[in-house]
Amino acid sequence: MKYNFDEIIERRGTNSYKWDLVKEDGVIPMWVADMDFQTASCIIEALQKRVAHGIFGYTLVPDSYYEAIISWFSRRHQWKIEKDWILYTSGVVPAISCCLKAICMPGEKVLVQTPVYNCFFSCITNSGCEVVENELKRVGNCTYEIDFEDFERKCADEKTTAFILCNPHNPAGRVWKKEELERMNDICLKHGVKVIADEIHCELIMPGYQYTPFASISEACRDNCVVLNSPSKSFNIAGLQIANIICPDATLRRRINRAININEVCDVNPFGVIALQTAYNEGEEWLDELNQYLYENYQAVKEFFNTELPQVRVTRLEGTYLVWLDILPFELSSDEAYEKLMNDGKVFVNSGTMYGRKAGQGYLRLNIACPRKTLMQGLIRIARVLSQYMDEEDLSGCPA
């Protein structure tokens, strides 16, 4: 590889949310979704050049910003975006809130597919709306599929006005197929439900799978959705706070733009603008190598648990760098496992119940976007703790 993802870079003492939230020494953080790799060197160099200028006043967003987005999605994903569709903002979570305020009235219902990214819940409730769950169906202990009967039943409720899609899905690891996306949109259209597609992990795809932008599938999908994306996950630049709302429908776009301004998330900083342009114009080679390294990390996780502790069932990872571990065979709840791993194992993972009290029970979320040495140290600690709570009758691991 041209880029060294094995390099261990000290992040403690940098006010890192991932590393400095827990003050106790020796804890390996494998939780929140940022990576322990330096971003692409081209981005670092572009930011250094901007810093050298020394003046950091209010910034305009140039045409080259939009051109970078349009070019990237055209050549990487065969999705033709028009400049007018793009609204910039400071992050995908603020974007979700703005979209909900533009689409829903307080008291209405918003559908999500649990287990799912925990901020969806707070965005919905903070908008005065009610969370409705379409729980994904576990298949063969190793992956998930959509319960379409339940999905339509929830959409048919006249109070359900929006559906937040997670594609790729965090934490279930699915990269939804075109046919699945089309079927969901058909149901949403039938019942007047708008789709808000969170596609922030769209560049983090495992070999053999393909991300399909929701709005690229058909005119019907395009006209019924808002797509949210950002280079923050794929290029590890979340702290630069840059994201985009892609909304082809002009009427809805005006409402969202109004919500962005009302909620004062309409300004972005020059570093985010420069980082996005550089990532999309020059970062492709780095991203491809990153995905290869993440795939090797995922293979290492599967091999480790299949060999050392097969009772831990590793959910198939199609996209993201977040591995969903099934610990149902153990005599621990998700929250108990989280506490034991933190206190006894000194490894920080996410309890599955963050992503749905019912759908996430018996699971842990593991961030594998770290150097392999760090990953293996974390896995050893996890196995050492969980092995004390085994149900000896359940030895069923996932197929390799």
Map each language-model feature to its residues.
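N-terminal small-domain helix-loop-helix segment of the aminotransferase-like
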Residues: K2-G91, C98, A279-E282, Q388-Y389, ...
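Conserved core segment of the aminotransferase class I/II
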Residues: E45, E219-Y295, E303, R384-L386, ...
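A structural alpha-helix within SAM-dependent methyltransferase catalytic domains
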Residues: Q48, E152-C155, N185, L189, ...
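Conserved core of the PLP fold type I
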Residues: F56-D186, E203-L204, Y211-S216, A220, ...
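Hydrophobic residues in well-ordered beta-strands that form the structural core
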Residues: V112, E133, A197, V349-S351
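Conserved glycine-rich beta-strand-loop-beta hairpin in the small C-terminal domain of fold type I
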Residues: V273, Q277, Y293-K302, V314-I327
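PLP-dependent enzyme catalytic core of the Aspartate aminotransferase-like
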Residues: E331-S333, K340-F348, Y355-A400
